């Protein structure tokens, strides 16, 4: 009887404390005609909660997204949507490239503490051991390339939208690795977590800055499992050690879209060195004059290097407050010392030695989260900057406070998001001096294209959502009579592009 009661009690506890699961959007298909695109999908929820379903349309412009109001959307959209087979029809907007987001969520919330606690110090340590080594464009080019590859591979494997921003630094082409986890309803509002991945030529760079890279990688793994209203962007910056070259190029040479609103940057700059010994923390000259309260508090604690420094300017108060709140809420054992520099930090050059400064110069809110570099870690920029000198508990807590801030500020959704890219193009029937016939329409098992005076051409056929179905080049002899087998193509509306030296003919062809 005792064992039976314990079993019943255990089941009750599991049921009582089990997390409500978010709804899921599954089995999505789309059908398109000349006027609308219809999305068919299955809405599932383990608890059969009714959901709110939204559809957002954005016009793609370069690397940015512009919200678009589309009237006449019909179907299973709005509040109190039950589970089951659903459909939403969207009137086609004007010519252009678009992002369509379908969002479904219930009335529940995630346990954010549980997400924060997913940060794994053993994982951080493993990443640090691998990252440790000379990551420098001349003194350690092979190791630098290996780290670049692992960052790119991680971002791709997590199904983010990765990109590489490049710029020249002398004869060297620097590479900033970027991964975007786009927001469901406000993708142009962006939170950034960054770290530079290079190091000085004469050190293994464990604290500076493998800790930052490992922390960013850990957050990117965890964040990938969730959806947000706003976008979260991860950036691995190159050539920081030569004067913030990578981040300056990113901010000033096309890395940021003019349509983007950067709501906060969490820049990791050495986050792993900790000491609870008296006099392990020194301060820059004049620190006590600019920051008297913080200086007095550090002195009262016997100058122990047992805190993370949260460096902000006045424009960065919002993201700074979010980090402090997260530390207090989710990691109360992490001691945070916040410094607000005047203006953009011209009076405090020691607080401008990392990539946050590039964002400050551009008027973007950014923090430098740091253990204090050479004012605490005497292994800074030496061959002794190794993993085994670092404190995983401290580093893990910094990462936890950071991910907590991102969860809150990016507005996590207890739900699912389906994204689809849509291309809308108006047909062009003819070109001067060229005769082209594309038939039959609707097509059957063979699509015929005949032409006169076309010369060399390329035939490109894609769905209206942009998926490439067929692409082939033809010389002038073959272009007059082309036959394309279409028996295996699904029913849809297709865009046929017949491209010649004189121009491009576009025709919409339907398969029923």
Give the positions of each predicted feature:
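Bacterial Sec-dependent N-terminal signal peptides
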Residues: 1-22, 426-428
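A glycine-anchored, Pro-Gly-centered beta-turn/N-cap motif
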Residues: 82-84, 88, 96, 455, ...
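Acidic/histidine-rich catalytic neighborhood of metal-dependent amide-processing enzymes
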Residues: 200-315
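N-terminal capping segment at the start of a domain
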Residues: 108-143, 198, 376-385
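Extracellular acidic, Ser/Thr/Pro-rich low-complexity tracts
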Residues: 42-49, 59, 453
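Active-site-adjacent substrate-binding region
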Residues: 271, 277-422
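A non-catalytic alpha/beta surface segment that caps or lines the substrate-entry region
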Residues: 126-182, 336
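C-terminal outer-membrane/trafficking sorting elements
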Residues: 429-512
């Amino acid at each position: 009887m005792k064992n039976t009661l314990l079993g019943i009690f255990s089941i009750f506890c599991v049921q009582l404390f089990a997390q409500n699961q978010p709804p899921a959007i599954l089995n999505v298909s789309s059908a398109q005609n000349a006027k609308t695109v219809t999305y068919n999908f299955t809405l599932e929820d383990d608890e059969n909660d009714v959901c709110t379903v939204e559809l957002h349309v954005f016009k793609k412009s370069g690397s940015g997204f512009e919200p678009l109001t589309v009237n006449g959307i019909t179907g299973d959209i709005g509040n109190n949507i039950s589970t089951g087979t659903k459909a939403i029809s969207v009137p086609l907007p004007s010519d252009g490239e678009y992002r369509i987001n379908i969002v479904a969520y219930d009335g529940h919330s995630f346990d954010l503490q549980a997400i924060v606690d997913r940060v794994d110090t053993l994982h951080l340590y493993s990443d640090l051991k691998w990252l440790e080594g000379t990551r420098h464009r001349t003194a350690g080019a092979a190791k630098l390339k290996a780290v670049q590859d692992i960052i790119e591979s991680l971002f791709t494997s997590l199904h983010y939208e990765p990109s590489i921003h490049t710029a020249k630094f002398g004869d060297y082409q620097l590479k900033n690795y970027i991964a975007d986890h786009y927001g469901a309803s406000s993708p142009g509002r962006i939170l950034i977590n960054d770290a530079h991945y290079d190091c000085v030529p004469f050190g293994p760079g464990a604290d500076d800055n493998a800790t930052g890279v490992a922390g960013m990688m850990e957050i990117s793994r965890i964040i990938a499992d969730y959806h947000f209203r706003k976008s979260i962007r991860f950036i691995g910056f190159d050539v920081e050690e030569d004067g913030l070259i990578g981040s300056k190029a990113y901010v000033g040479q096309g890395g940021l879209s003019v349509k983007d609103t950067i709501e906060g940057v969490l820049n990791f700059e050495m986050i792993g060195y900790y000491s609870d010994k008296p006099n392990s923390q020194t301060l820059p000259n004049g620190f006590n004059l600019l920051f008297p309260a913080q200086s007095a508090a550090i002195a009262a604690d016997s100058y122990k290097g047992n805190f993370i420094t949260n460096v902000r300017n006045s424009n960065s108060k919002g993201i700074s407050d979010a980090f402090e709140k997260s530390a207090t809420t989710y990691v109360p054992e992490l001691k945070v010392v916040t410094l607000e520099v005047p203006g953009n930090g011209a009076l405090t050059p020691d607080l401008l030695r990392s990539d946050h400064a590039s964002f400050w110069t551009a008027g973007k809110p950014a923090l430098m989260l740091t253990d204090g570099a050479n004012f605490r870690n005497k292994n800074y920029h030496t061959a002794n900057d190794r993993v085994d000198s670092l404190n995983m508990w401290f580093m893990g807590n910094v990462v936890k406070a950071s991910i907590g801030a991102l969860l809150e500020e990016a507005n996590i959704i207890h739900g699912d998001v389906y994204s689809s890219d849509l291309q809308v193009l108006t047909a062009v029937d003819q070109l001067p001096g060229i005769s082209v016939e594309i038939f039959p329409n609707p097509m059957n098992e063979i699509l015929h294209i005949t032409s006169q005076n076309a010369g060399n051409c390329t035939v490109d056929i894609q769905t209206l959502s942009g998926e490439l179905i067929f692409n082939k080049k033809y010389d002038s002899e073959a272009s007059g009579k082309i036959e394309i087998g279409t028996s295996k193509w699904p029913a849809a509306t297709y865009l046929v592009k017949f491209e010649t030296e004189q121009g491009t003919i576009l025709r919409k062809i339907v398969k029923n």
